[in-house]
From Swiss-Prot:
One of its GO terms (cellular component) is periplasmic space. Keywords: Hydrolase, Periplasm, Signal. Belongs to the AtsA family. Residues 1-25 form the signal peptide. The keyword Endoplasmic reticulum does not apply. One of its GO terms (molecular function) is 3'-tRNA processing endoribonuclease activity. The gene is atsA. It is found in: Periplasm. Its main location: periplasm. The keyword Transcription regulation does not apply. InterPro entries: AtsA-like_MBL-fold, Metallo-B-lactamas, RibonucZ/Hydroxyglut_hydro. This is Arylsulfatase. PANTHER family: ZINC PHOSPHODIESTERASE ELAC PROTEIN 1.
Length: 328
């Protein structure tokens, strides 16, 4: 299979930055694949919603599963039957919309391996709801008399994680922290019940932090300290609010103010992404979960320059299906 290497050369006034990603699959490579790079919840014709695949020692792990994840996996040659685990950073629908397809199509294609879904409190209830949705289809199966269909939850396990959880899997360890995507008062019932998480994956000789959705967070900065790769969300908050105004002209002004406040606290601007990467002294930076989606090199350069005003290391603004080798 032909190997394609693409290098972003961003000749900025601050210097030349380059980041290389691989465009072809390899069973022996450890890779991070940005399956979907567009922030939700509005569907986009050019970009799928937030989802990633991490390939380690030939095993497949999905990190967030936005709408379209199953199809995006197929585009990079990965079979949903071979997914070993799904990690959910939080339970907003643009990060979970693809999970029903993964679970139901695995059932329909008789997947035999166990799939573990890791996620914040509420993940078990979410997955149970997917099983409920699958009930009628599983009972009818293929409509052949005498068939005894397997239960919807066959070979599916849920493990709820939260701030401070540490996991040890055969291929890596995982550290879990609560980030600032939610702003419930600390100690409140909502604070206990709803958590948005960031993950640190420590492979044998490589480390990756996936921020998930987050605003500025000292906990995320600490988690990211010295990692080889930071995969961070990013949002142009002013542009996003203006887009909402254009599509919702009748919305009261106070509503827009509230939306702007929410986005500013719960997401990262380009400059804030650079500040995070700089403060954590990460080896390289991949930016995903963009709002708006970036389609031209001019748009990519515009936002990269803002990030690079703070962080001087290698930067890649990811597109759907980009592949990054996890190797020093």
């Amino acid at each position: 299979m032909q190997k394609i290497s693409i290098i972003f050369n961003l000749f900025l006034s601050l210097g030349c930055l380059a980041f290389t990603f691989n465009g072809s699959a390899s069973e022996t490579k450890n890779e991070w694949i940005t399956l979907g790079t567009m922030a939700g919840p509005i569907p986009n014709a050019k970009h799928s919603q937030p989802a990633n695949a991490m390939l380690v020692n030939g095993n497949t792990y999905v990190v967030d599963a936005g709408d379209g994840t199953a199809g995006q996996l197929a585009k990079v040659g990965l079979d949903i039957k071979n997914v070993d685990a799904v990690f959910l950073s939080h339970l907003h629908f643009d990060h979970t919309g693809g999970l029903p397809a993964i679970l139901s199509l695995r059932w329909q294609t008789s997947a035999r391996n166990e799939l573990v879904v890791y996620g914040p409190p509420g993940t078990q209830q979410t997955v149970d709801g997917i099983f409920e949705y699958m009930t009628y289809g599983t009972l009818g199966h293929y409509g052949v008399p005498g068939q005894v269909p397997a239960p919807a939850n066959t070979n599916i396990k849920v493990v709820e994680v939260e701030d401070g959880t540490q996991l040890k899997l055969p291929d890596f360890t995982v550290d879990v922290i609560r980030n600032s995507h939610y702003s419930w008062p600390k100690g409140s019932e909502e604070w206990k019940k709803f958590q948005a998480l960031s993950f640190k994956f420590s492979l044998q000789d490589y480390t990756v932090v996936y921020t998930g959705d987050t605003g500025p967070s000292s906990a995320v900065e600490k988690l990211s300290s010295g990692v080889d790769l930071l995969v961070s969300e990013m949002m142009d908050i002013d542009h996003t609010v203006n887009m909402i105004k254009e599509t919702n002209p009748q919305m009261p002004k106070g509503k827009f103010i509230g939306i702007h406040k929410h986005l500013s606290k719960h997401h990262l601007s380009p400059k804030q992404v650079g500040e995070l990467a700089k403060a954590a002294n990460v080896g390289s930076l991949v930016i995903t979960h963009m709002a708006p989606g970036l389609d031209t090199q001019a748009e990519i350069d515009f936002y990269t320059k803002q990030v690079a005003s703070e962080y001087k290391g290698p930067i890649s603004v990811a597109q759907d299906l980009n592949r990054y080798e996890l190797k020093r």
